[in-house]
Amino acid sequence: MHCLIKNKKEELVYLIAFICTVVVSMVLFVYWGNGKRVTFCDEIYTYNIVNSDGLTPYEINKWMSGDDFKNALTHGNDDYYEKMIDNIKMDKVHPPLYYILVYIASKLAGDTLSVWTALAVNLFAYLGTGCIVFFILKKLFHSPVLSSLGTIGVLMTQCMLSAGMLARMYMVYTFFTALFVYANVLASDKKADVARSRGAILAEIAKYLLLCAAVVGGFLTQYYFVFFVAAFFGFEIIYDIKEKRFRDILKYAVALAVAAVFINKLWDYWYVAITSNAHSAGVIGNAKEIFEHLGSIYYGYKLVIMYVFQNAYKAFLILFPVLVAVFYVVAGGRESSYIRSVVTRIAGAALMYAFVVNVLTPEALSSTRYYYADMLLVLLAYIICVFAIFDKIIKKGGKVKRLYMTAAGICIIECDSSDKRVRC
């Protein structure tokens, strides 16, 4: 009975922490969203592709009224789904999922022209990303306070707020990246596979279905998502071979294969889009020379660290790897093997993605937005390492330990919120 009451109390605390996290996140987003101004041409393309007859429905050397522009950017009776799909295929640069979501928002908004048409989609993705980060930290540290503070620390960063404020697909892309990371965190917990009860089997199936859903959503939002998949699958193979869990490699591969089937059924235009758009030649040319650029791994790392830590990036170029190294030393022993594997996968995938995207993207197209999802991985690795180190070195238990850990969480929030040049 006492155990039941304790569990109920713990669940209530988690619920309160979760609700507080969501509320704070929503306030953050709405605050910055109210100051949003469209200053980037691609944001106009978002509205054009969803609501117009073509990619550029503006006539040169002809007077166009305000209503002409408004009609091109808002949903009307003559706008329909198939027209939007045709626009996406003509554009050939991005998959359709984000545009479909904005199409739904535009249909609900009607002829009202507002930045919140696109930001509403980003708001759900921003809050969803926060929820997933909360669940990841809950899984690793079993602390409502750390889960809440760590999540707020992530969402308060310049990079996450900028992703949310950009009326493009990168916040949704970040959401699916977070979901994919969470699915990998669950899949890499091999202790959970020991029990073979019906409930345990269903839970195992569920985590691979989650993995599959994340891959489908991620790839249908941004084609670069495939590099995250390749990186995490590579680490899964390495760990499973090391632990002689060859069946787990097969499970993971089957989940990816099922995802590939769904992707091809839902959007079979992906291959044409990737190989024949205006930038394909440059990307493919860079891909053929990728092994000649192995020496530039550092530049990919430097780029993403600079985007995450802003003015403090020079210090964090050294501090971040030192932090990870200290984590590996402090969190030694078999009892910490799970959290070490999680950090290895997240930090390793972040580095690999930064390198590949930096090499493949033509220099003229290189932009912060391609790295927003990767920045989330860097932030996760950073926060997990800090919390794990504090957890190991603070020997005192109970309230004293929770106090120290809370202080660590607050420090992370202060660090992350020190530079707020958000792109609005």
Where are these predicted regions, by residue range?
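Transmembrane signal-anchor helices characteristic of membrane glycosylation enzymes that use polyprenol
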Residues: 11-72, 257-271, 413-415
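Specific aromatic-rich, kink-prone transmembrane helix
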Residues: 104, 132, 152, 156, ...
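Transmembrane-helix motifs of polytopic, lipid-linked glycan transferases
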Residues: 117-141, 179, 329
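Transmembrane-helix signature of polytopic, membrane-embedded enzymes
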Residues: 133-156
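Transmembrane alpha-helix segments characteristic
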Residues: 148-150, 210, 253-257, 333-360, ...
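Hydrophobic/aromatic-rich transmembrane helices and adjacent perimembrane loops
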Residues: 173, 227, 361-399
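Membrane-interface alpha helices of multi-pass inner-membrane proteins
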Residues: 201-223, 257-258
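Hydrophobic, aromatic-rich transmembrane alpha-helices
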Residues: 237, 311-341
